[in-house]
């Protein structure tokens, strides 16, 4: 089962950071998510995903862009990755945190890493025993229908732009969690690899 694919677009990461930080600083959000697209009501809060792909929202109908993003570099980058995006959001994961291991009801997501420090923050697929980091300037397709988590081992927030293919339909497969010991095991192994690389570097 394919878990991810990397695309090298050579995005202007400094310009992306500037636009993303402007949105975050001007629109505080306790949920650490900012909706760049909306379904019915404009704004950065109305279409955030608090259920993390659980099917609580029809994500493929979230296709309208907030008007101030009309000529933005963010929007330009998203359309370079995919011609039919939906549910585009900025997501922030605080330092030292990770998402619960889960399965999304939508089969895949596209990711544009904005603030990231590989290999210290990374996707983890415990069931498949796979870890991978995302690099600035690139974009990624991620199979979120597989058990996955995201781990931020950096002493700063991790910030990504994330969106769907609007043609992707919700799958009724129930969300499930995986025993945390499986996640801890591969995180420990990943830390050992990082330490070895730094030691020999």
Segments (PLM) and residue ranges:
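Non-heme Fe(II)/2-oxoglutarate
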Residues: 1-79
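A short glycine-rich, His/Asp/Glu-containing loop-to-beta-strand
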Residues: 75-95
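Short, conserved beta-strand element in jelly-roll/cupin
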Residues: 92-94, 103-120
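A short hydrophobic beta-strand segment most commonly corresponding to one strand
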Residues: 109-114, 139-141, 155-172
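A short beta-strand-loop-beta hairpin characteristic of the jelly-roll/cupin
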Residues: 115-135
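Conserved metal-binding segment of the jelly-roll/cupin
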Residues: 132-148
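Asparagine-centered strand-capping/turn motif at beta-strand->loop junctions
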Residues: 149-154
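C-terminal interaction module
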Residues: 175-201
């Amino acid at each position: 089962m394919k878990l991810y694919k990397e695309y090298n677009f050579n995005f202007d990461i400094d310009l992306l950071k500037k636009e993303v930080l402007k949105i975050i600083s001007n629109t505080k959000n306790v949920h650490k998510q900012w909706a760049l697209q909306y379904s019915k009501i404009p704004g950065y809060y109305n279409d955030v995903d608090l259920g993390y792909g659980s099917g609580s929202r029809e994500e493929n109908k979230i296709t309208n862009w907030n008007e101030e993003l009309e000529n933005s570099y963010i929007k330009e980058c998203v359309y370079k990755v995919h011609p039919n995006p939906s549910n585009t959001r900025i997501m922030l994961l605080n330092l030292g945190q990770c998402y619960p291991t889960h399965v999304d009801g939508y089969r895949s997501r596209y990711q544009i890493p904005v603030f990231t420090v590989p290999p210290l923050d990374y996707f983890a697929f415990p069931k498949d025993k796979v870890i991978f980091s995302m690099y600035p300037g690139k974009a990624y397709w991620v199979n979120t229908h597989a058990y996955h988590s995201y781990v931020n081992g950096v002493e700063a927030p991790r910030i990504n732009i994330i969106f769907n293919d609007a043609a992707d339909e919700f799958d009724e497969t129930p969300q499930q969690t995986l025993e945390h010991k499986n996640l801890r095991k591969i995180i420990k192994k990943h830390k050992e690899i990082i330490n070895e690389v730094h030691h020999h570097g």
